[in-house]
């Protein structure tokens, strides 16, 4: 069965039509003997504005509560009638009364089932098809249904601000440390205490605790920011640190995506934390001078450009390279054979690791279920999905992975990753954006 979603017109009155809800499931219809609920929109929501995608999650929950209430009111009324009629004093009940009470019991059960349905409403920036297995696994393990809305990081944060207290979101999944930090600073997440999460996720891969010890967000998977190079033109020793991307010896050799992309902003925020603002700005200026072409495309485009000879060195997230390494397409195999890979700064602070992470929404209506979902994502089953399905490293401590591409990148050996708090990277982003403007990094 399907549930209908109500739209409100500019006057606040309920219109004469309904539209199908986008979230299918076992629902009672607004049909038959059920009168339409008369609700006004929340005071802080403009009824003239069009409903946001997924707004039906909240409407659906309101309707379930109303239907359960409708059933319970009928039960009370029936019981009152029975008492008034003094039927309880009868030595035997007629078939009619028995049928009536049976109907009461069935109605109560149906209402309770609707009222107690377990759900968690997810806003996710993870657009990876392999994550479907995560959601299925969670529902199978807990019985909690996931209602999901997909958007990019910036879109999700903007939507949470617009929805305010009316937001149906319970869990937020974002794919960049800087955006997680921004959501925390904007008050869009609620700090939580979870021994499961705090034991599993290292302190440097989560937000700093608030006064009562609560954590606003947790990293759930990691990805390295790597340097790739053309093996026929460049020696690995010439690009084994991030600093060498700005060295004059590499003038005219560098390809990179836009400096304002979140993956680069986080890298630049990390370098700023290590070098200080003055040296970091000089480094950014040096990279601009070393560009082989204006920044464009995504990380995969940079890898292909190195293989094609358009540039000699480039910067990419590890999972983009891993995808190509696991591909059987001849063109991908040819690219991989031409490029080498560097995990930068192994002799100093270590390779920058960005995160994908999660938080409980500030106005979560299903807070307990939200915490359960984050705890599930930090468990061994989900962490292995991240590694094998999307070529990410687990954020949780003490897990071994069996991803052939990730092993090949590191030649089966551990590598040194930076240990600065990832929240410090997010705190540097405003400075980084100002520096990019000053040095003309597009």
Q: Which residue ranges define each predicted feature?
A:
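Ligand-binding pocket segment of bilobal, Venus flytrap-like solute-binding proteins
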Residues: 259, 263-266, 270-344
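Extracellular/periplasmic bilobal clamshell ligand-binding domains
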Residues: 402-442
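Early extracytoplasmic/lumenal segment of secretory-pathway proteins
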Residues: 116-182, 442
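Mature extracytoplasmic/periplasmic domains
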Residues: 356-419
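A structural signal for short loop-to-beta-strand junctions that line the ligand-binding cleft
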Residues: 167-172, 190-227, 243, 254
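Short beta-strand->loop
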Residues: 123-126, 212-217, 229-231, 237, ...
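Sec/Tat signal peptide C-region and signal peptidase I cleavage site
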Residues: 111-115
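Periplasmic solute-binding protein
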Residues: 180-188, 210-240, 268-269, 353-359
């Amino acid at each position: 069965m399907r549930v209908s979603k109500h739209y409100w017109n500019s006057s606040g009155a309920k219109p004469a039509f309904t539209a199908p809800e986008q979230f299918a499931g076992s629902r009672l219809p607004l049909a038959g003997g059920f009168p339409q609920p008369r609700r006004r929109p929340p005071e802080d929501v403009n009824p003239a504005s069009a409903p946001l995608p997924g707004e039906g999650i909240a409407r659906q929950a309101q309707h379930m509560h109303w239907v359960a209430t409708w059933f319970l009111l009928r039960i009370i009324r029936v019981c009152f009638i029975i008492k008034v009629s003094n039927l309880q004093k009868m030595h035997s009940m007629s078939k009619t009364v028995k049928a009536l009470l049976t109907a009461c019991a069935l109605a109560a059960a149906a209402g309770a089932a609707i009222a107690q349905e377990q759900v968690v409403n997810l806003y996710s920036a993870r657009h990876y098809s392999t994550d479907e297995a995560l959601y299925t696994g969670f529902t199978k393990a807990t019985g909690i249904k996931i209602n999901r809305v997909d958007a990019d990081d910036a879109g999700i944060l903007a939507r949470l601000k617009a929805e305010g207290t009316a937001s149906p979101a319970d869990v937020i999944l974002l794919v960049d440390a800087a955006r997680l930090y921004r959501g925390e600073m904007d008050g869009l997440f609620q700090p939580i205490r979870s021994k499961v999460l705090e034991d599993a996720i290292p302190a440097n891969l989560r937000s700093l605790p608030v006064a009562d010890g609560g954590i606003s967000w947790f990293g759930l998977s990691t990805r390295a920011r790597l340097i790739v190079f053309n093996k026929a033109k460049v020696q690995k020793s010439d690009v084994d640190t991030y600093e060498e991307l700005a060295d004059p010896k590499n003038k005219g050799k560098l390809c990179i995506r836009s400096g304002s992309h979140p993956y680069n902003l986080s890298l630049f925020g990390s370098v700023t934390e290590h070098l200080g603002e003055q040296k970091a700005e000089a480094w950014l200026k040096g990279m601009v001078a070393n560009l082989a072409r204006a920044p464009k495309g995504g990380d995969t485009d940079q890898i292909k450009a190195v293989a094609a000879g358009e540039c000699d060195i480039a910067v990419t997230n590890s999972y983009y390279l891993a995808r190509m390494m696991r591909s059987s397409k001849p063109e991908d195999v040819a690219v991989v054979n031409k490029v080498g890979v560097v995990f930068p700064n192994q002799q100093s602070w270590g390779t920058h690791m960005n995160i994908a992470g999660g938080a409980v929404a500030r106005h979560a209506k299903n807070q307990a279920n939200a915490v359960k979902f984050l705890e599930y994502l930090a468990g061994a089953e989900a962490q292995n999905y991240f590694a094998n399905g999307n070529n990410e490293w687990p954020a949780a401590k003490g897990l071994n992975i069996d991803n052939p591409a990730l092993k090949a990148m590191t030649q089966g050996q551990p590598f040194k990753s930076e240990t600065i708090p990832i929240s410090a990277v997010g705190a540097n982003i405003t400075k980084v954006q100002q520096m990019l403007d000053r040095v003309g990094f597009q």
